[in-house]
């Protein structure tokens, strides 16, 4: 989901990203029912029943819809915060590893670049995992061939990637390329990444309670189909149009909640996970283009600290 600056009327009449496609059939159905009730009224059939307006108080239905939409937006915002945290933790982890891990040989530099690519692989694997997609070519350039095929067989690929990163950190500590304080600090960032993964999984696998969704839909249908009987005496042939407008409003609010409650897909209102992953890849590439300010034994490099 990307938001470009547009004129007010451009946004108002924009179809992409709106819920019109999801609700127009229900709206037309309600409007036609309003026309049918009007026709019956014109044929002197006593269908006008204004008292039906008290069957479902408007304020009750409004509160239910507001609660539904707010709950869905909370899920959307929690998902965005989790991915924002993934970005920040990835940047901090990459910086800490690049600067703190000492290099003894060229292989150490290559290993550091590989583990930094694993950080991007974690984000990509998380994206695919949340979308229920298999491991694909997006990861081929980020990890070795053996690890690529290993991930294909895993039930939770991002968790496996986090394990590989943790294994690398432990190896560097064993080789005395990291001290205990550095290891603890970096592992805390890695733990935060796994926590972010868990937050996203919680959003994905905790849908709205079924009973609430069923009852809200039943109330919406009752309200919209009882509406013509309340209005037909005063509105006449305008009843169908007004019922259509009211149902458009109510069904639209409910559809917005459905649209944003799972923010990890491909819909226009979902989070731009592809763009976020690409941003992290560019950040890592920029970082690895810099020389790490650490002690390097066999690389012919020394730390230059200017005070």
Curated annotation (Swiss-Prot):
Location, primary (coarse class): membrane
Assigned protein family: Belongs to the anion channel-forming bestrophin (TC 1.A.46) family.
Repeat keyword on record: no
Subcellular location: Cell membrane
Membrane topology annotation: Multi-pass membrane protein
Gene Ontology MF terms: chloride channel activity
Matches recorded under Pfam families: Bestrophin (PF01062)
Segments passing through the bilayer: 19-39, 47-67, 209-229, 238-258
Keyword field: Cell membrane, Ion transport, Membrane, Transmembrane, Transmembrane helix, Transport
Assigned GO CC terms: plasma membrane
Protein's organism: Nostoc sp. (strain PCC 7120 / SAG 25.82 / UTEX 2576)
Domain of life the protein comes from: Bacteria
Protein name: Voltage-dependent anion channel-forming protein alr2987
């Amino acid at each position: 989901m990307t938001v470009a600056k547009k004129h007010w009327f451009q946004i108002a009449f924009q179809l992409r990203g709106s819920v019109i496609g999801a609700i127009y059939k229900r709206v037309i159905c309600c409007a036609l029912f309003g026309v049918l009730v009007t026709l019956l009224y014109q044929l002197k059939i006593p269908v006008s029943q204004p008292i039906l307006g008290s069957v479902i108080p408007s304020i009750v239905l409004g509160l239910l819809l507001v609660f539904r939409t707010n709950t869905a937006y909370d899920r959307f915002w929690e998902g965005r915060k989790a991915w924002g945290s993934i970005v920040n933790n990835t940047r901090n982890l990459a910086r800490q590893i690049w600067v703190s891990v000492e290099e003894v040989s060229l292989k150490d530099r290559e290993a550091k670049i590989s583990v930094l690519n694993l950080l991007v692989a974690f984000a990509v694997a998380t994206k695919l995992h949340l979308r229920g997609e298999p491991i694909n070519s997006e990861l081929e350039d980020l990890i070795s061939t053996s690890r690529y095929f290993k991930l294909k067989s895993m039930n939770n690929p991002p968790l496996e990637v986090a394990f590989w990163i943790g294994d690398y950190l432990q190896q560097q500590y064993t080789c005395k390329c990291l001290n205990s304080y550095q290891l603890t600090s970096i592992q805390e960032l890695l733990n935060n990444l796994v926590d972010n993964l868990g937050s996203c999984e919680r959003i994905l696998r905790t849908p709205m309670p079924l009973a609430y969704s069923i009852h809200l839909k039943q109330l919406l249908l009752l309200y919209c189909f009882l509406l013509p009987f309340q209005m037909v005496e005063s509105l006449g042939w305008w009843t169908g149009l007004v019922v259509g407008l009211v149902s458009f409003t109510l069904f639209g609010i409910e559809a917005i909640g459905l649209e944003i409650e799972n923010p990890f897909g491909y819909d226009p209102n979902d989070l731009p996970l592809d763009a976020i992953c690409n941003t992290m890849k560019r950040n890592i590439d920029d970082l690895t283009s810099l020389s790490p300010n650490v002690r390097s034994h066999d690389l012919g490099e020394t730390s230059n600290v200017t005070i």
